[in-house]
């Protein structure tokens, strides 16, 4: 079983613009801030911590146990250069910041890192402020979830939607929960 995704619209916007326009990381980050996609202090996004937190939530949901995002190998996009993007593009790849959770024989593996994604991967065409999650399961096969992941309106809409759902169904609301048992994440062995 594997869940791998582009979980941060801000970083995906930055990487998409760098790939499409050949612009530098710094210039693209400034544009993302001007458009309201990146915070004034973008560290949580560009250093991978937002994606790491979301990856920890996904791992907690599938395992039923707690996962600390600090336990997940995390590398952001701060060091991805326009030269890296040009090489990836020339080879037919796109660089995406991925959060990934894999289970193998009751062991859990997780990482967050910029990775080269090939054209045949369903995550390849996920561009701009969009997020995408690829889920691979034994019975399910491969499926994708896709939607906007950055900007004031998508964020506000998601928060308001959650509040309304909780209020409407408060009498029978059952949140997703997990035990207090902590997950042990296996080292990736240099894969990330």
Model regions and ranges:
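Substrate-binding/catalytic subdomain of NAD(P)-dependent oxidoreductase enzymes
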Residues: 28-125, 130-132
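Residue-level recognition of short, well-ordered coil/turn positions
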Residues: 22-23, 37, 93, 171
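Catalytic cores of large soluble enzymes that bind and process phosphate-bearing ligands
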Residues: 2-6, 20-24, 43-51, 73-80, ...
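Catalytic, metal-anchored helix/loop core of enzyme active sites in primary metabolism
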Residues: 2-4, 12-15, 31, 36-40, ...
């Amino acid at each position: 079983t594997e869940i791998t995704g582009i979980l941060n619209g801000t970083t995906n916007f930055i990487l998409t613009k760098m790939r499409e326009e050949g612009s530098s990381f710094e210039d693209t980050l400034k544009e993302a801030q001007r458009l309201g996609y990146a915070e004034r202090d973008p560290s949580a996004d560009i250093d991978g911590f937002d994606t790491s937190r979301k990856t920890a939530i996904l791992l907690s949901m599938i395992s039923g146990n707690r996962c600390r995002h600090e336990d997940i190998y995390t590398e952001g996009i701060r060091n991805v250069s326009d030269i890296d993007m040009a090489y990836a593009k020339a080879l037919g790849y796109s660089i995406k910041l991925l959060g990934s959770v894999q289970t193998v024989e009751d062991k859990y593996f997780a990482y967050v890192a910029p990775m080269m994604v090939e054209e045949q991967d369903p995550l390849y065409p996920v561009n701009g402020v969009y997020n995408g999650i690829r889920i691979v399961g034994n019975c399910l096969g491969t499926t994708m979830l896709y939607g906007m992941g950055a900007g004031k309106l998508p964020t506000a809409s998601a928060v308001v939607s959650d509040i309304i759902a909780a209020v409407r169904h408060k009498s029978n609301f059952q949140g997703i929960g997990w035990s207090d048992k902590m997950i042990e994440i296996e080292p990736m062995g240099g894969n990330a």
